[in-house]
Amino acid sequence: MADTDCKWDPGADKYPLLGFGQAVIGPPGSGKSTYVRAMQALLAQMGRKSAIINLDPAGEDEPGAAVSLRELLGLEEVMSELRLGPNGALLYCMEYLQENLDWLRGRLQGLRGTYFLLDCPGQVELYTHHPALPDVLRRLGAWGLRLCAVHLVDSHYCTDPAKFISVLCTSLSTMLHVELPHINVLSKMDLIEQYGRLAFNLDYYTEVMDLSYLVEQLTSDPFFRRHKRLHEKLAEVIQDYGLVTFMPLSIKDEKSLRLVLSAVDKASGFCFGETKQSLGNLMSVAVGADFQFTSYPSHDCRG
């Protein structure tokens, strides 16, 4: 495991804003790394400097990543030395990062002002109930990194009512646990027709409309018919909170990627400018003033 001596400049703390960025989260296979690379390419096209921060100790080093957790420790190393399985080793890596966060802080200080793309691990419990990663993200926020969580979910779950209800529960739990501005994304929309026919229009899934219709779709299966009451209660919880909606995304469609970036920029506050400007801008919005995003050309969130 690497030396964790802190190399950040304490004097730099007089500048409170480290930068803006996205914490890209979601289950395995949802397309996080592909999204990160596509988003970096889009940002470069728009003239916005960005850096990929690979926080997944399990994957191979992200091509072009400015910082990789594997510089500090790798999953295989932890599994070998501590005789842990893959899941236990990944949790250990996150806890190790949590305890040695000055290492990451020092690396990010050298990239101050860059737009950060945090490529996070795919283990679901890291976002739903384990404390390490949410604590890391909160502490980065306290150090001046304004993050928005981008939660990717494979759109194939829309083709199965039971799986979609499960995804809704996971998304809600993640939003409540991570406690960041949050954008849920249905990824791989270009493949959705290959997954099977949807029971409802796409808007039904993205806007999470009346879930009672989805529960009714489960009654054709004897197993789910026996647990209909459970699914009804889960649907009630999701709709009572009223927090979960999705944005559709196809990496092959630049327009959909720009729409996600625009939503992220608004959620994180990037559109409202740097620290000295942002309070006034936010207050203008709060009192109903006519705010023009074009006031800050370098922070144009319209794409």
Swiss-Prot record:
Keyword ATP-binding among record annotations: no
Residues bound to GTP: 29-34, 187-190
Pfam families hit by this protein: ATP_bind_1
Keyword tags: GTP-binding, Hydrolase, Nucleotide-binding
Keyword Hydrolase: yes
SUPFAM superfamilies in UniProt: P-loop containing nucleoside triphosphate hydrolases (SSF52540)
Motif Gly-Pro-Asn (GPN)-loop, chain ranges: 85-87
Signal peptide annotation: none
Sites annotated Stabilizes the phosphate intermediate: 87
UniProt GO MF annotations: GTP binding; hydrolase activity
InterPro entries: Gpn (IPR004130), Gpn2 (IPR030231), P-loop_NTPase (IPR027417)
Family (UniProt): Belongs to the GPN-loop GTPase family.
Protein name in the entry: GPN-loop GTPase 2
Organism expressing this protein natively: Xenopus tropicalis (Western clawed frog)
